[in-house]
Amino acid sequence: MKTAPITPGRLAFSPDGVPLAPEFGDVYHPAAGALQQAHHVFLGGNRLPARWGGRGRFVILETGFGLGNNFLATWDAWQRDPQRCERLVFVSIEKHPLTREDLARAHAASPLPELARALVSAWPLSTPNLHPIAFEGGRVQLLLGFGDVALLLPQLVVSVDAFFLDGFAPARNPEMWEPRRLQRLGRLAAPGATAATWSAARVVRDGLSAAGFTVETTAGTGGKRDITVARFTPRHIAVPPPGGWHAHDAASREALVIGAGLAGCAAAWALSQQGWQCQLLDRAAEPADVTSGNPAGLFHGSFHRDDGPHARTLRAAALATERLAGAWIAQGRVSGQLAGCLRLESRWSDDAARAAMAAQQIAPGYIDWMDRAVASTLSGLALPSGAWFYPGGGWLAPRDYARELLARSGSLFRGGIDVATIERHSGLWRVLDEQRQVIAEAPVLVLANGLGANGLLASGRGEVPWPLTAVRGQISSLATDGHPATLPCPRLPVAGGGYVLPQTGGRLLFGATSQPDDIDPALRDADHRFNLQQLAGLSGCDVEAWSSLPWQGRVGWRAVTSDRLPLIGAVPDLEALDRTSRADQPRFVPRQRDARGGLYVFTGLGSRGITWAALGGQLLASWISGAPCPLEADLRDALDPARYALPRWRSDS
């Protein structure tokens, strides 16, 4: 999907205080009030809250978030309902999101002040992607999609129980209500889905009918004579693609996760947000004790001229990390700093960088360009070039982060467990030791043990469909005590041909080497000298002054894929792939089902484990639980482990 620049909405008010959208020449809601319309049209028209009573999860899709009044009214109704669903998921698309300041102005006199303040506080940057936001400890989940409905509707991976068709009038915003847009709703509708809109225009009713809905009009409100309500009654039930976009059909919501590093702990946390219970097994005695045990690491997004899959997925991942870990850093639960990150870039001139940003109209709160002088002042180092500045980036202690994820998940951790093989038995996945004694079993198994995932996968099913390379990395640190005047201690992380972090715990941490297929666990002087040279390149300082200082280091191995993107999702069924007639995209590749279903992988995070963890866990949880996917469909494909099976199908087809 090619993203389009986001133009923020403008907010004005009529003389009697009704909020207006000047670009559309229309009101955000009628003078009678937004909540009255929300209750009569959208909640009442979808027979809510009655329909969500007793449900494990209820999903609403809204076309046009606007001021967020429909979401607030729905959240309030959920809070007040003693029979409420276990989890409420509200997905909403908005082409012109307001700034946080305008959203706060719009809700200055909200009749739901606490909920409105929570929404304003959580309001994301106006970047062109999906933004998952959790309230009520994860029991109310808002998934905001900023962009054109024409681009985002085909990219949603979601099963919708109720549609709130909002937006400005068809006469003023015809693209929103085009029949082909409305017809796409049928692809997303769950059995028994309903829809409601304040518009009774013929084009709206015909579009819903063509999408498989039975349409009728009923009494309106707020000056509207009629409104439209509809029930999904398709003539034919669509068969999901063979790759399966749906949840694993498990009788109990229990999962085994092998590996208790960042990936495994994030998987457990995200699954707990969907009501799943996990048991984590790890060879180490404590969680996050191997590669995720580095004392500190940095995180930030990415920027490319074409805004392709790498840039888009890393942007979404960095924003998710900032939202989750940033709060824990502020609370003192995770050691770290959320004060931005600089990434040096000598290939860009100042003019070219600013022109690329202007072309994408990227939100300044996500990225900015700083020339050499400004970047040097910000960092406190004499930098050799200009740099991209990521305001939401920073550094944290990955062990703290992983253990906080694990603690919040409520999962059982079992350390000192050496899993030798895996097998499927009587509808459950079993993990076994060297003596083939059963260690644990569950209907769902997640391989989140880095490089060890391939060996276990081979033990349980034979062929491994993807390459995974072990890349050795050695980091270095120097004591800052007694050397503050000579060591280049930045005020914030600086990266680009290596990295250096602000001093913490009396030490300066920098690195790192990148050595594929090097299995030497010993610290090496040559690698420390290499890290010093990288530090010199970042800081403009002479390394000779530090080469004789005592140093410490740590060695770990990153699991890296050939395309530098993680492997997150259901393991493909290669035998079924050989028999399928269509597998031109990862989503169509068959998965393990029935006797061999319930096998998932979360590995290949490379050197960006901190950045990938939160979003990767949420993506994995959506695969397993059937919750709305936090990424667009093409980005889900880009991280799908089945992408490596496509050449096999093409060669056989």
Curated annotation (Swiss-Prot):
Cofactor(s) the protein needs: FAD
Catalytic activity from the UniProt record: 5-aminomethyl-2-thiouridine(34) in tRNA + S-adenosyl-L-methionine = 5-methylaminomethyl-2-thiouridine(34) in tRNA + S-adenosyl-L-homocysteine + H(+)
Pfam families: DAO, Methyltransf_30
Sorted UniProt keywords: Cytoplasm, FAD, Flavoprotein, Methyltransferase, Multifunctional enzyme, Oxidoreductase, S-adenosyl-L-methionine, Transferase, tRNA processing
E.C. designation(s): 2.1.1.61, 1.5.-.-
Domain of life of the source: Bacteria
Region (tRNA (mnm(5)s(2)U34)-methyltransferase): 1-233
Principal location: cytoplasm
GO CC entries: cytoplasm
GO biological process: methylation; tRNA wobble base modification
Region described as FAD-dependent cmnm(5)s(2)U34 oxidoreductase: spans on this chain: 258-653
Subcellular location: Cytoplasm
Gene Ontology molecular function terms on file: flavin adenine dinucleotide binding; oxidoreductase activity, acting on the CH-NH group of donors; tRNA (5-methylaminomethyl-2-thiouridylate)(34)-methyltransferase activity
Family: In the N-terminal section; belongs to the methyltransferase superfamily. tRNA (mnm(5)s(2)U34)-methyltransferase family. In the C-terminal section; belongs to the DAO family.
Function according to Swiss-Prot or TrEMBL: Catalyzes the last two steps in the biosynthesis of 5-methylaminomethyl-2-thiouridine (mnm(5)s(2)U) at the wobble position (U34) in tRNA. Catalyzes the FAD-dependent demodification of cmnm(5)s(2)U34 to nm(5)s(2)U34, followed by the transfer of a methyl group from S-adenosyl-L-methionine to nm(5)s(2)U34, to form mnm(5)s(2)U34.
UniProt protein name: tRNA 5-methylaminomethyl-2-thiouridine biosynthesis bifunctional protein MnmC
Organism: Methylibium petroleiphilum (strain ATCC BAA-1232 / LMG 22953 / PM1)
Lineage, uppermost ranks: Bacteria, Pseudomonadati, Pseudomonadota, Betaproteobacteria, Burkholderiales
